[in-house]
Structure formats: C-alpha cells, structure tokens
C-alpha cells in the first residue's frame, strides 16, 4: 500500500500493510464486438446518449476514479468503548485467520490502544468484559476521497456488522451529496445482501442459496430477490453482490452453501429468476424498488483443486464451457448489471488476468455490456500471490487490459495513481479506460441514480414485515430435506423429546455466514426475536415436553469448528426421561478462507454423542444443520430418521418444527451429491467409467459410485407415481424442440409438492459422455389422488456437448430421457457441429 497524504490513508491502515491479518480477514463484497450477436440487453438510445455526453466531459482523473471501489471503513473509525484487550483472545483470533507466528508475537507486544487501532474495525472479540462498538464517518476524509480522487464506488458495512436503516440512510445520502457536488456522478454503493438484507438490521433474512437449490422452486428465488431488493433500497443501497452461481462440486469447499448446488442447470435457472427479482423486468430502467446485481464469481471459483478457498482450479475445456460457464452465460443474457470475478486461477491463468475469459467470452461473444468488478484486493494478488505480475503497477496493467472495469481496492487510492501513469505511458489505452467507464456509467444510469441518487423513507413500509417473513418461512419449509424416515415422522405430540447437539439452541447456525456480520458470528443480539430450534420445538410441542441437554457445544471464542469439552454423559443421562431424541448436529457459521477444513467428517465429538445416545435404545432423529455435506456414514445407520435443513435462515427453526409435526410437508431435494467417504466425491453427472466399489476380482464393472444419498433425493409424507412419459417425436435433429410430457399422481393421503426432474443420457459419443445430465425441472403441488401432466420443452441442441476440438457437437445416435423411474428412448438422425462458441 502506497503511503500517501494522511488525509487519504488512515494511519492504522498504513501500519496494517505489513500485517497479514488484513489479507486473511478480506471480505467478499464478492468489449468490442464479435459475431452477429445482439446485445444481451437491448440498448436504449436515449440512455446511451446520456452516457456518451457524460463521458465526453470527464477528465482522466474522473474516469479513473470511477474505476475504483473503496471500503467504507477507510472513511471513518470504529471506537470501542470500555475496551480492555484480552491478549489470549487476540492470539486466538490471529491463529484462526492464519497470521504468521512472528506477526502475532509482534502485535501482542504492542499497547492495548495500538492493538485496538489495528483490529477494531473487524468483527472479532478481543476484549475483556462488555464493550460497545461505535463507528463514525469522517466527513473530511470523505470529502478528500471524492473531491480529489473522484472515487466512484464504496462498499461494505463498518466493521462488517449490520447497520440500521437510519444509519445507512445517513451515510449513503452524505456520500451521494459529495459525489454529486464534486463530480456530478452518483456513487454506486454495494453490499453483500446475499440471502436477504444481511447487513441491515431488522430486515428479512432468507435461507441461504443452497436451500433455494434444494427447493427446486424458481418462484421462491424470484420472490426472495424481489423482497431483498425492496429492503436494500429502503436502506438506500442500489447494488448487491449476488447471485452466486459457483457450481458447488467439491464438498470440501467452504462456500458450497453460497450457491445453488452442483448442477449447472439448477444454477442457471435460479440465477435468471433471481436477476429478474432483483432488477425487475426492464434492466435498462431499474426502478427505486429494485437493485443492480453482481453475479459472482466468474467462474470456476467453486472448483479448487485443494478444496481450500481461493486456490487454483484445473478443469477440462469441455467442463468449463459446458458447466462452469453456463450459469454466467445465462446471467449475462438475463441482463445482470455487473459480475464479480473469481479470485483464483483456472488452468494456471488467474481470471483477473484472462483477456479470453473476461473480454472475449463475456463482452465480445455474448455482447454483454455490464461491468466487471474485482473481488477484495484481487489485482494485488496478481503479484503478491499468483506471481504473474512484478508489482502492483504491472498487475493493474494486466487486469485492466484483460477486461477488469472496476478495482475493489479497499484501503488505498494507489490504483488511481498507477493507472494514470499507465495511461500516460501508453501501456493502457484510452479506449480501454473509456470502455470501462462507459460500462460503469451505464449501470448507474440504468439504476436511475443520476435522477434519484437516494431511495428509502416513504413507500418502504413493508420493510421487515410479516408478509416478507412468511415468504422466508415458506422457502425454509420447501428446502429442508427428509433423507430417511423409518415411520417415526411426523412426530406425534405428547412425547418427551430430548433435544441435543451443538446446533440445537443457536441462531448463528441457522442463519450462517454473511448474516449481520461477515462470518455470521457475534450477532446473537441482532437475531434475538427469532426462534432457535429449541424455541421452535417448545412452541410446537410445549416447553414441558422438551429436554435440552446439548452434550456438545461450540466455542464461540475459537474458530468455527472449535468445540468445548464434550459433556456427552449429561445427554445420555437426560435420555432416560425422553421418548425420542432429536440430535441437531452439523456446523457453526463460516465463510471464505476461515471456513477451510482439513477433514470432511463431521466432528468426532458430535459423532460420539450420537453413538452414545444410540446405546440408550431411544429412537434418534438426526437434524443436519450444515453448509456442506459432512460425512456421517458411521452414524446414519443409528438414526431412525434424518433431516437435512442446510442453512435455513431466521425461520428455519420454525420451518423444522412445522415439518416434524406434519403441519407442513417435506418437498426439498438434495442440490448436491452427499458422499459416503472422502475418496468418493463424485457429482451426479459422473462418467460411467468413474464407477468404483468393492472389487470382485480384477475388475468389477457392476460396481457403483459410493454415496450416502444422490443428487435430487428427498422424501415426503406422501408418495408420487410417475406414468405416461412421452415425447412428441422419437427422431429429431439439432433444430428441433422436443416436447416431453409425464403424468405425476399423488398416491398418498397428504397434500404435497414434488420437484419433477428431467434427465438425459447420451448412450454413445465421440468423447466419454456423462452418465446423465439434468436438462430441466419444475415443481408442482398435488392434493391426495390428484394427477397433473408436466410438460417440458427440450431444445435438441441442449443435448449437444463440447467435442475434443472445442466445438459444440450433437451426434447422431441414441439418447434416453428419464423422469422419476420412467424412461423413453429418442434418436438423433444427423450430426451437427457448430462453429460458434455459444449455441
């Protein structure tokens, strides 16, 4: 970080330069023409004229300033009242976030005030006793940053902790006032409102995106996005860093729960629904009740070779084009206003340095005219971590020329200085600067910020309303998954229930990361009005019938996986008074690098708790509350029922109580493959040749992939029968639309919803085909005895694959379509090979 005039960089951040904690505590906020492709969003001539007029009057300094995004923390200071540092807590925090021992010891030798100055802006507990954190905006600093450096975007919540609507109104209105005064261009303020207004107190939090994937209901995705947009605008925030469509195909990755699961079609359909909900029906004219989206993280961020956050991916060209690119392509075509870029590399190329992926694939091939923003300080990573640039200036040159339009450089204006040097030296052309700024201005005009820089106040009376709460509850009910039921559910009232496990009585586990704070920790005071699982079950079954003895609890002063010494004997003793045991197990909240793990197995303490309770002879219902599928193969056989609630949000406990009691019916299905063992982490669309198992000789071609439960699996209190699977044609060619119909009947005695999934299999291909691929899905509701006919319109080109030559190919031959257990065969009569990158 360059040392500038003191009114530019707060001294605490200059000192923090050498402290690697800043890096490990980083936040996710997260074009020319080619082909005869129409723009993803049809251009509005009047709006484009305004963009050109504004661009024509801007100086180089103003243009470069628009390309910089700063963290709000740099414009103020966090004061911690009654602060006395607990050095053991400081040591624990530094160790948790990976600070080197040498840096840790150096910090511990500093005075209390020096430690507070360096760490007070972060949502970590390093204090003795009770404290109160107060953040104040420095108007002089804000003046300088906007008047001198022309900063065009600001992000984040102070200390990454949710603020009130009134605070957001005060801060953003002042920012907009300064922006319009000094440069005549409004700021575009961004927040990680990922599953509701996560950084705004009193708003509506929804289940995490992985739950939306489990619901298989795109209408829920759109509704949740509409509500989040409304409540974001109530807080005066016009831009959200969402949706997330990183395919979660490695269960070790700490951000599995932030996407819609492992399948590209689920992610693609959900992202389109969310973009429509967030932005409304006209992305050229987004009204005051909708927001701009930043679809992220473009792309393959969720495929780290090591399973660790922000580490390299190594993928075949076919896998990239067919699967990892697909949701982002659909997001671009749906008009997402912006995209955020993957922090890591793919096949040795950092995404922030890839002209092919950033400019050619997105801006040229798709004619997408939004802007690309980096993730947290990721241009710096090109020289500090990826080693493809010699210094920061070189990294800026590489990234901007590759296609990056806005740099999230949280604590420094050095970007502006170095980029100006690059332009003056001819290393970055003025045409590239103009292209980037034009895209940023386009987003601001589309959001209506020039005409109405601020929103909120009158017209936003539904903020945090019961109406919105009901939508969140419905999403939770439709996304919690019944994985096993040996006749114990619905659970009759009047029984004594032992409620145990570390997730039984904590809101943090239910709302997950990006909830009030970055890690979702130390925010219990902001979620007190919602019900934990314990409180929800007390409301449903009567407090006198619920015995709470957790046996294992989380250590809130440690890492997300830290647990106190177990007290399993107490839980076993309490089981004597119970008729049934509900064990709430899983994970505490986390996100990003702090959520890395070294062992996919559920913690030994929790598994030992279940094993000990099994010996009591009382039936056990396992409730899994987790952001990724932790291995439970040794305890699943001990359970009479298993429910996976994933991360269901503030109404997840209420939803679970309704479902366990039979007042609502399960309809969720797994959005990922649940593995049984660490050496079998296949996804559902594995190659047939990947099937492995116990060898019955030299080879066993009848072996299957080892898994706990398959993708798309989920039970209900009723049963559904599929019949009459038909297609309107048995032979087809590439330009055909295949109409697929199937009858679905509710054959049980309870009303229920069913996600209907359409799969295809290519029986023989010139490269090894996937064993099956999801092609479409929908969700229906059926009364007992009711039958509905479901219709899918399947474009034949969707059955194509990327061949060895990199071209889309549909080969003649046999295909099988499957819905439920029903199959139908169809035949492609002619091979077609496309010369275009997208079909």
Question: Language-model features: where?
Answer:
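Short beta-strand elements
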Residues: 823-838
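Glycoside hydrolase catalytic-domain context in secreted enzymes
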Residues: 32-800, 811-823, 839
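Bacterial Sec-dependent N-terminal signal peptides
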Residues: 1-40
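Short proline/glycine-enriched turn/loop segments at secondary-structure junctions
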Residues: 805-807
